[in-house]
Amino acid sequence: MNRSTISPVEARQQFRAGLIQPTSGWSAGFAQANLISMPQDLAYDFLLFAQRNPKPCPILEVLNAGETFGGIFGSNATEADIRTDAPQYRIYAHGELIDSPASAVDYWRDDLVSFIIGCSFTFEHPMVQAGVPVRHLEAGRNVPMYETSLACRPAGSLSGNLVVSLRMIPASQVADAVRITSRYPAVHGAPVHIGDPSLIGIDDINNPDFGDAPLSEPSDVPVFWACGVTPQAMVMSSKPPLAITHAPGHMLITDAPDLGFQVP
């Protein structure tokens, strides 16, 4: 199975049928997205949190309370279901992780408002096309992600620290990586930090908070991008009564072409 050539519809069908795999490298050319669903009485607070923290929380679409599909799935919107079409989910109750199911249907409520947030997996295909290596993608692994010491701007009852994803980039190609990804602001855009991880509160780069440990070559430099797992750090810090998210690295694959998020 060549996961890069599978259509978004086919990918969602496989995940709906129970396949659990990180989605880096799937359905090349199409945008991937983070998900968080929260009770309606917290929806404004999260919308404000995202507006105040656009690097980690670039909103692609907001669904009405109880809605389970959106326009980002294009002509296939009614076929899609955000409760089943990511490979794996995380269920939080009062900030505690209580389950990591392959389907969120059993936890769904009609008062949940869902936010679909841009994901950096979207710009990995353009990086590869430009000859910039993406180590975890080459190895079929999940991207490493870390909670930093950098506080997000709070909103209402919601607060938490920035989460970043790491890609080890050859020093000679860091400028290329910055140039390419800066053209995709709706999916986190340019890096937020390059170099020494300790400067953003990461003590051990080989022990990520989410995902797999990084792979690197001797000439590589650590490059960090804002990450859509930041809302999960916010959930663990703010302890809302219920939140449904994707599992880190296990994204919703949309029908939106990645070039649609590229700016000049």
Curated annotation (Swiss-Prot):
<dbReference type="GO" id="GO:0016829">
    <property type="term" value="F:lyase activity"/>
</dbReference>
<dbReference type="Pfam" id="PF07286">
    <property type="entry name" value="D-Glu_cyclase"/>
</dbReference>
<protein>
    <recommendedName>
        <fullName>Putative hydro-lyase Cgl2544/cg2803</fullName>
        <ecNumber>4.2.1.-</ecNumber>
    </recommendedName>
</protein>
<comment type="similarity">
    <text>Belongs to the D-glutamate cyclase family.</text>
</comment>
<dbReference type="InterPro" id="IPR009906">
    <property type="entry name" value="D-Glu_cyclase"/>
</dbReference>
<dbReference type="InterPro" id="IPR038021">
    <property type="entry name" value="Putative_hydro-lyase"/>
</dbReference>
<dbReference type="InterPro" id="IPR016938">
    <property type="entry name" value="UPF0317"/>
</dbReference>
<keyword id="KW-0456">Lyase</keyword>
